[in-house]
Design a protein with these regions (language model features):
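ATP/Mg2+-dependent ligation/transfer catalytic cores
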Residues: 3-254, 258, 283-298
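Long, charged, glycine-rich C-terminal linkers/tails
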Residues: 252-261, 312-318
Length: 358
């Protein structure tokens, strides 16, 4: 009995050590706040950041994760933004009919317009007692002088839509519902992107039947339920980790799928199979919104793994049971020269119409 109590206390202590945000660590470098010298000086004050990883996204959403020693980044800083510091084998990722085996070189061009995140390995401590960190810098993939990755497609798509909208509004032809829009005062077209991330968590060694999950869903057993045990602890830590990286989490809650977890003789939550959701603040930079989503998935996976839980972001991981929807909220607005912002998707009469003509 005493041994069991000690084991339980030890587990609790370890969990407490895991979930504390370390104020001595650097979790992200905000875009636009530091120049070259500022970034280099900041990194030198955090020697536990030992690696740099350029994060490129292929056409299937896979992200690269290599380990470049931090000394090379500090020495060749400008080369990382010129696309001459790091290359990868494009034939090994999903770039269909673009980077082939005999023409596979893809250059990685670092992106300074978005936040850079630091990913820490808590299983590997540096000499100062802090976990070893990797600076993750989002990048574009360049092949034969052309950008070919998902991030560049998103950037070019937004630029294309903005240009077409400017041309439409400045054409002189009346746009229904936009007659009062001060076209001559428009300085820029901007986008707002907000995502909602749903996911399933489960105990890896346990398997629940579709029938059990389906019955629970029909009976609405998980609707408005509280999170308990290691699921609650992992969710709370994930929120703290995301907030520490400047994502401004708005909500974490249970979704409709799942079953009630069991409790063992020591009070530990076991046999977990639940559906959850995490939401954070939208971004005025579509690339930043996409990067936030990717980084959030990585952090959530790592945090829940520490508590013995497996995470799936698949749209339909279990046939016949509620899937994980990916709600993406898109807004388009006109930024005026006087600093005012006008929502281009809102109709002139909110009671008569749902959306504007645009």
């Amino acid at each position: 009995m005493q041994t069991a109590i000690k084991d339980q206390q030890s587990t609790i202590i370890k969990q407490e050590e895991f979930k504390m945000i370390n104020n001595d660590l650097l979790y992200y470098i905000p875009s636009g706040e530091f120049g070259k010298e500022g970034v280099l000086g900041l990194l030198k004050t955090h020697p536990e950041i030992r690696f740099v990883s350029l994060v490129g996204i292929d056409l299937a959403g896979n992200d690269t994760d290599e380990k470049v020693p931090i000394e090379l980044f500090l020495k060749n800083y400008d080369d990382f933004f010129a696309g001459t510091a790091v290359q990868t084998d494009g034939s090994s990722v999903v770039l269909m009919n673009i980077a082939t085996l005999n023409d596979a070189r893809v250059d990685m061009v670092a992106d300074a317009s978005v936040n850079w995140y630091i990913d820490y390995n808590e299983d590997n401590l540096y000499s100062n007692g802090r976990p070893v960190g990797t600076l993750r810098i989002p990048c574009f993939l360049l092949h034969n002088g052309k950008f070919i990755d998902s991030r560049s497609i998103l950037k070019e798509s937004c630029a294309f839509v903005a240009e077409k909208l400017k041309g439409l509004l400045a054409s002189g032809k009346p746009v229904k519902g936009m007659e009062d829009l001060p076209v001559d005062e428009i300085e820029d077209i901007k986008f707002t992107i907000g995502t909602e991330l749903e996911f399933w968590v489960k105990t890896p060694s346990e398997t629940e039947t579709v029938q059990h999950l389906s019955i629970s869903q029909r009976l609405q057993e998980q609707y408005w339920q509280r999170m308990r045990g290691n699921v609650r602890t992992a969710m709370e830590e994930a929120i703290e980790e995301l907030d520490a990286r400047g994502m401004h989490v708005e909500m974490g809650h249970k979704e409709v799928g799942g079953i009630k977890p069991k409790v063992d003789d020591l009070g530990h939550t076991v046999d977990v199979c639940e559906q959850l959701e995490l939401d954070w603040l939208f971004s005025m930079n579509p690339l930043q919104a996409a990067d936030n989503e990717l980084e959030a998935r990585i952090i959530i996976r790592e945090v829940f793994r520490k508590y013995g839980l497996d995470v799936s972001f698949q749209a339909k991981p279990i046939i016949g049971v509620a899937g994980s929807g990916e709600h993406t909220h898109v807004g388009i607005c006109a930024s005026l020269k006087n600093g005012k912002t006008i929502n281009l998707l809102a109709p002139s009469d909110m009671k008569a119409d749902f959306l504007s003509t645009i």
